[in-house]
Amino acid sequence: VYLANRTAAKAEALAAELGCNTTTNAEVAGRSDLIFLAVKPQMMEALLAPLKFTLNERPSRFILCSMAAGLSIARIQEMAGEDYPVIRIMPNTPASVGAGMIQYCSANVTAEEEQEFLKLMAPAGRLDAVPEALIDAASSVSGCGPAWVYQFIEALADGGVACGLPRAKAQEYAAQMVLGSAKLVLESGKHPGELKDAVCSPGGSTIQGVRVLEEHGFRGAVTDAVIAAYNKTKEMGKG
């Protein structure tokens, strides 16, 4: 495994953590079978432009793997100069603890190469193949979603602190609750609304909290956040 970064210190720090080697972008482009393009969309063209010759001169097959939001496979191929095999992925931060949700789509990739890719990525979490037309929408839910969940956990902890809980305990309880609730949704196969109703006893405290969230537009705000993220992703892809 080879790592390259425009800031050498960052590459060296990550290499020390993972037990990898550091090198240059050109060296990665010339030697690696699977080349991860981990830059922001607006930086992709500047990254690939000086690598076109190196990629074109390679005698062996390779795959470009892009995680740049909004950039289509066709656009990546255009920037790289040829219709190279490309896998486009949308990871999220929970992948760093093996609990990610990663969507992917590909072009000019063989079934065997796809299986090798899935085997490599499996430790990061769940992977799901989607049509490229849906990957920006998927990213807006699971790619951006962790930030909103962190906000929710923080807000829950704030509420717990306001009611007298120590900060560390409030945060632990909130985070474990979110983890367990998500696990129940995935493993039970039940609709989230059904699971919500099961917690809300008639005249109880939970339904009063649900009422307050509805009064403040909680559901609509979350939906609007996803749509706003989706629109921004589409905008970045045009830049």
Stretches found by the model and what they are:
Residues 1, 11, 44, 166-174, ...:
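Small-residue helix-packing motif on alpha-helices
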